[in-house]
């Protein structure tokens, strides 16, 4: 339990964190990786280079300071981060290392006096304990459910399927021949990739793109532009070098962006680009479980060449009367225009959504590039969709949709 004095001191640093938060977290990661380079086997190098991880951590530290007198308020965020930590294999012993480096960064960047550093040291201990406790429960649950396991387990790529010019699916089965644990539609797994010539292991999280209850997991990966770009290194390796029969270490499914199976409301699945992957898991689950809920599947792509899984979605729409699918192409090809195989040219807008979705009393799920997600969030706000009915997932560190 933190003293009133400690809480007061930590809360007094909120303006400082607002002003220098990213500077502090940038310095923190420099210290962390300089003194503990082995942790580069866990953290996503791309998010480091782009500054996304630094921003996400700055946001988390700022929230912790703001709500230090009411940490219950940030438990949902702690759980969301906890899912990623469990998926990556972050353990209790990592927290003291992080705490030491964070306090050093606060001192170096802000010139914080000992009184502030001591207060933050106490506060960090309480926050770390919350993470450790929640993540311990997650490790237990993942390991002890049927077909479950702890940390990483080797999976064989039994099938590799090209879904579009830029997206390929990988079907994964356990190398040990055992069962795979079930998951909730919308969840992801972490895969480990060791690229020849690279010093450190690359971890990447990919949404599971099929319904649970199969003998395999399926991930569907977008090939990012440029082999030498941070984004493209792993995705190009998967597309170009990983083949059927290869083995990849995989973590148990994780994540809190999940389909609410208890709701009876209609379901609206809105995706942009590779954001279609968790939506496919949700769609397939709804039809396989014979749900009678109306489903509106809205997808945005550049054109038919980059539009993955369109034949499957069309087949589902044709077979199940409760499913309606709509496609928006930002730059349709001449063939697309000739075939009229899409519903709207340009971008998804609130006025168009109003014409294809008859009610705002529905569960709305969306995923895609950050700019797309900001646009969709604004559109749903325009339509006065209730906040509790809006669900979304970032591919990478969380950011603001405002």
UniProtKB/Swiss-Prot annotation:
Consists of two distinct domains; an N-terminal heme-containing oxygen-binding domain and a C-terminal reductase domain with binding sites for FAD and NAD(P)H. SUPFAM superfamilies: Ferredoxin reductase-like, C-terminal NADP-linked domain (SSF52343), Globin-like (SSF46458), Riboflavin synthase domain-like (SSF63380). GO terms for cellular component: cytoplasm. This is Flavohemoprotein. It comes from the Bacteria. Is involved in NO detoxification in an aerobic process, termed nitric oxide dioxygenase (NOD) reaction that utilizes O(2) and NAD(P)H to convert NO to nitrate, which protects the bacterium from various noxious nitrogen compounds. Therefore, plays a central role in the inducible response to nitrosative stress. The lineage of its organism: Bacteria, Bacillati, Bacillota, Bacilli, Bacillales. The record marks 84, 393 as: Influences the redox potential of the prosthetic heme and FAD groups. Binds 1 heme b (iron(II)-protoporphyrin IX) group per subunit. The keyword ATP-binding does not apply. Belongs to the globin family. Two-domain flavohemoproteins subfamily. It comes from Bacillus cereus (strain ATCC 14579 / DSM 31 / CCUG 7414 / JCM 2152 / NBRC 15305 / NCIMB 9373 / NCTC 2599 / NRRL B-3711). GO terms for biological process: cellular response to nitrosative stress; nitric oxide catabolic process; response to toxic substance. NADP(+) binds at residues 273-278. The gene is hmp. Residues 1-136 form the Globin domain. The active site is at 95 (charge relay system), 135 (charge relay system). Residues 150-260 form the FAD-binding FR-type domain. Keywords: Detoxification, FAD, Flavoprotein, Heme, Iron, Metal-binding, NAD, NADP, Oxidoreductase, Oxygen transport, Transport. Its EC number is 1.14.12.17.
């Amino acid at each position: 339990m933190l003293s009133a004095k400690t809480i007061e001191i930590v809360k007094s640093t909120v303006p400082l964190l607002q002003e220098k938060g990213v500077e502090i977290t940038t310095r923190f990661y420099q210290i962390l990786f300089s003194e503990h380079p082995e942790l580069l086997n866990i953290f996503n190098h791309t998010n480091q280079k782009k500054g996304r991880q630094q921003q996400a951590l700055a946001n988390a530290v700022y929230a912790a300071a703001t709500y230090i007198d009411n940490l219950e308020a940030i438990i949902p965020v702690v759980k969301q981060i906890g899912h990623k930590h469990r998926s990556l294999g972050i353990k209790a012993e990592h927290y003291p290392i992080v705490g030491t480096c964070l306090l050093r960064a606060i001192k170096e960047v802000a010139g914080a006096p000992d009184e502030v550093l001591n207060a933050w040291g106490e506060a960090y201990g309480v926050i770390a304990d919350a993470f450790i406790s929640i993540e311990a429960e997650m490790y237990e649950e993942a390991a002890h459910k049927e077909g479950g396991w702890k940390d990483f387990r080797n999976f064989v790529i039994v099938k590799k399927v090209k879904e579009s010019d830029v997206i390929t699916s990988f079907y994964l089965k356990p190398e040990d021949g055992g069962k795979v644990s079930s998951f909730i539609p919308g969840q992801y797994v972490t895969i480990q990739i060791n690229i020849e010539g690279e010093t450190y292991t690359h971890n990447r999280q990919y949404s599971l793109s099929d319904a649970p209850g199969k003998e395999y997991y399926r991930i569907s990966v977008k090939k990012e532009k440029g082999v030498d770009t941070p984004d493209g290194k792993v995705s190009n390796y998967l597309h170009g070098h990983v083949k059927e029969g290869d083995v990849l270490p995989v973590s148990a499914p994780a994540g809190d962006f999940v389909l609410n199976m208890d709701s009876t409301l209609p379901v609206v699945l809105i995706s942009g680009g590779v954001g279609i992957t968790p939506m496919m898991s949700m769609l397939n689950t709804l039809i396989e479980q014979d749900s009678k809920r109306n489903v509106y599947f809205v997808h945005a792509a550049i054109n038919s060449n980059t539009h993955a899984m369109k034949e499957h979605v069309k087949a589902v729409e044709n077979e199940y009367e409760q499913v309606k699918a709509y496609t928006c192409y930002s730059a349709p090809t001449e063939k697309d225009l000739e075939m009229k195989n899409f519903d709207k040219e340009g971008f998804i807008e609130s006025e168009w959504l109003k014409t294809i979705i008859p009610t705002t009393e529905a569960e709305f799920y969306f995923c895609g590039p950050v700019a797309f997600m900001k646009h969709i969030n604004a559109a749903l706000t325009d339509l006065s969709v209730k906040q509790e009915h809006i669900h979304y997932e970032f591919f990478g560190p969380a950011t603001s949709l405002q």
